[in-house]
UniProtKB/Swiss-Prot annotation:
Superkingdom, taxonomy of origin: Viruses
Induction: Expressed in the late phase of the viral replicative cycle.
Function: One of the minor capsid proteins that constitute a network internal to the major capsid proteins and outside the lipid membrane. The minor capsid proteins glue and stabilize the capsomers.
Name by which UniProt lists this protein: Minor capsid protein P4
Keywords for the protein's UniProt record, in alphabetical order: Capsid protein, Late protein, Virion
Species annotation: Paramecium bursaria Chlorella virus 1 (PBCV-1)
Complex formation: Interacts with the major capsid protein.
Lineage of origin: Viruses, Varidnaviria, Bamfordvirae, Nucleocytoviricota, Megaviricetes
Amino acid sequence: MFSAFRDTASIGFSDTHQDEKTLRFLKKQISQFIKHLKEYYPNNELTKKLVMKYSDVQLLPYTKGATKDTYTSGLFDHTTGVIKIAPRDGLGNVRDEQSLNKSICHELAHGTRVKYPGESSHSDEWKDAWKTFLKIAADELGWKIEVPCSSVSFYGLTKDDCENCVWDQDPETCPKTAKLA
């Protein structure tokens, strides 16, 4: 069942209990976020698209990331509307609330658009939705959300995009990928 963790720490009974707690946390957070959108932004296109597409959240087993020494923290299945979020990092350690909240906002933003074959998942339209969701979650719901250097390097986030997020370092000091340089 947990063979995907072969390269990481071994998983025991208490770990699966922690994963179950993580799933309950994800369900609670997403429910709170969507309820907030429906109440305060009922006519907004992002709300309409997300409510139409989102169906559930599940845990994502460990998957190696697209670049060296990374893991896939989440994904949005456009066919089913299911968000899958990794409960553990690449070392097999349980992710904290700030990290999970970042993934929630990131993946919910994917649910606001239609992705066509061959098109980038991280389009400008998606980035705008993600920035909007980060601000709503941090400013209006009081969520603690991490913004690691990778979010600056890969997606071009700036302090202005989420002033109340928890930045792991000054965004100006984060390396830029060739795509953003």
